[in-house]
Amino acid sequence: GSPVFIAFRSSTKKSVQYDDVPEYKDRLNLSENYTLSISNARISDEKRFVCMLVTEDDVFEAPTVVKVFKQPSKPEIVSKAPFLETEQLQKLGDCISRDSYPEGNITWYRNGKVLQPLEGAVVIIFKKQMDPVTQLYTMTSSLEYKTTKADIQTPFTCSITYYGPSGQKTVHSEQAVFDIYYPTEQVTIQVLPPKNAIKEGDNITLKCLGNGNPPPEEFFFYLPGQPEGIRSSNTYTLPNVRRNATGNYKCSLIDKKSLIASTAITVHYLDLSLNPXGELTKQIGDSLPVSCTISAIRNATVVWMKDNIKLRSSPSFSSLQYQDAGNYVCETALQEVEGLKKRESLTLIVEVKPQIKMTKKTDPSGLSKTIICHVEGFPKPAIQWTITGSGSVINQTEESPYINGRYYSKIIISPEENVTLTCAAENQLERTVNSLNVSAISIPEHDEADEISDENREKVNDQAKLIVGIVVGLLLAALVAGVVYWLYMKKSKTASKHVNKDLGNMEENKKLEENNHKTEA
């Protein structure tokens, strides 16, 4: 079109005149040094301007072209695919940058490297659109991409390259990382709990895994001896397994049965048989074979206990004694399998017929004699004291605790004449009777050593003390032998006497001649 005058300044009048041009209204400023400034620049300001100098002689012109630039917005990737599937050409997203002048160029990057179009693998479609009002451009670039597993966690970006007053510039978008879908190429199977710790009664869980993304959610599970698979989620549980569950287990994909995994499972078991078991009653002297039989998938340790004390070897009874009685436990375990142990018990009761031993001892004061009836038997025998001849029962007795099948009953008497005491011990097996002649208190006699109690059985006298005692005893025996014989002969002629007040009145003893035929203990 025709040139339009927009501003004039006279060198003499020092005044500025602006023509009435609507698009430049209030936007022009012509300075004293003839510099023209245009404020609030617009795209329409991009045109050719001419500075004219008019003199009396001539007209001079100096043209210039004004370029207008607008920096675009930072590019961003929109309409992003939720995931990328391998071997599929699909739209990855759009890179968009707005409000640019002039238009810019968009470039796509994979892991920082420029993506170039490649048939069937990389397709880039570029579009630009100008706003009719602002005359600014919006650039859009769509990327179609065939991904591979190598793109897992790989960043994609795009950039806008544009021109400004100082030259070419580039602005990059934020990174975008996509979830890569790929098919399963391998199947694995897991066993919970770990395979080396499975025992009878456990619940086994088979877990099948595929290495695809997303992982498969369903599988076929194959049990030993069953060709048909069981469709299930990625886990399958076998409750309360028995030893016949030992075997090979497999799993495969639903849609590709050739992708299969297998594992061997061993169900550990442990059987224990104790014969005899429970509670058993035997008599002393009996023989008793005992066997503890173990059946296991591998070697197992066997431990015998008696009354919570570990035995060195298996018990064997060719002739039962009372001390063999007790609670026996046979226990076995597989050390490598936690919790796999078995135990059986035998409570052995050894019955013993009552056995009696009687002892007597004179008090050092010489005023009384202690008579003790030592009894061994099981069940615990009842003890009864009587005076031979009169049949009187003695009730004033003192008993020791019943320990290990033994105890004793003790009486203290002061007989005025010779007497015979009877101790009877009775349990459900038998009644046993023993008698002991006791001289009158005035007649010295040989005392018998007390029975050593079980709890003190291991405490024996020192050998030196024993020898000294024997020597002293022999000397004393030689000294009193004559005296004892004289007193005894004298007493044998004496009429019948009465037993000490502690025993009460007793009936008259048999004739002295009959007593003389009894053997004194």
UniProtKB/Swiss-Prot annotation:
Disulfide bonds join C95-C158, C208-C251, C292-C330, C373-C423. Residues 183-266, 271-347, 354-439 form the Ig-like C2-type domain. The keyword Repeat applies. This is CD166 antigen. Cell adhesion molecule that mediates both heterotypic cell-cell contacts via its interaction with CD6, as well as homotypic cell-cell contacts. Promotes T-cell activation and proliferation via its interactions with CD6. Contributes to the formation and maturation of the immunological synapse via its interactions with CD6. Mediates homotypic interactions with cells that express ALCAM. Mediates attachment of dendritic cells onto endothelial cells via homotypic interaction. Inhibits endothelial cell migration and promotes endothelial tube formation via homotypic interactions. Residues 63-172 form the Ig-like V-type domain. The gene is ALCAM. The chain crosses the membrane at residues 466-487. The CD6 binding site is located in the N-terminal Ig-like domain. It comes from Oryctolagus cuniculus.
